[in-house]
Amino acid sequence: MADGLLAMTSSHFCTAERQFRTPLSYGAVRTPTAQWTATAAGACLLRPAGQGVGIRAVTFGRVQDLGIRDINNMGAAMAPAAAATLLRYLTDTNTQPQEFDAICTGDLGHVGSQLFRELLAAEGLLLKNHVDCGSLLYDAEGQSVHSGASGPGCCAAVLCGHLLPRLERRGQHRVLFLATGALMSQTTFLQKESIPAISHLVELAAPEEQNGGNT
């Protein structure tokens, strides 16, 4: 077994725009559901034991595809995957949402977050402690970012720069973190194929709550 593993990811605004939308010089008008890919990064060091924030449980996601084809509405494509993973975790662990200080999704944005809560409400779960990295990263009122931030660097930056420090300081004790991702390519979206999505979950615990590995 390795003594330590470093997990890292990043994303870049201009690169994502050029590959999946339109070149910046084109000046295309964004739809209200569109998100802004974050130029951001984050890295976590995982060890079998230590004094840091602990990982108490993990739930691997399953691919969900509800037929969303709009590349400018990624939150709607990913929300069902996040909802399905959270429901499986709560069922498997026999826990309730209110037992956690926060349930944080990766980059659903404002539109996707609303859909996420609506999907769970249909299953009888009313989330009062849900936050989304895509909604937290930018100032929705002061910046014209439409539905918020997106990209793997978005959730990595919020996790490493905001959530983990709060757990370290005991500002929070138990947090569910759901990374969200879309499974597409430059070819599939141009062919107007549907956008499958997946979401993996980790339960993070402050040092005094931990019972397992550490980050």
Regions found by a protein language model. Name each.
Residues T9-H12, T105-L108, A179-A182:
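Short, well-ordered beta-to-alpha junction loops that form the rim of enzyme active sites
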Residues M1-S11, R18, A43-A49, S150-G171:
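Active-site-proximal alpha-helical scaffold in enzymes
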Residues F13-R18, V63-G67, M184-Q186:
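Short, well-ordered, mixed-charge alpha-helical segments that flank or form enzyme active sites
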Residues L108-E123, T187-S194:
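Short glycine/threonine-rich loop-to-helix capping motif typified by GTGT followed
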Residues M1-D3, H12, A16-E17, G61, ...:
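Conserved catalytic cysteine-centered active-site region
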Residues T22-L87, D92-T95, N129-S135, E141, ...:
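Condensing-enzyme catalytic core mediating Claisen C-C bond formation in acyl metabolism
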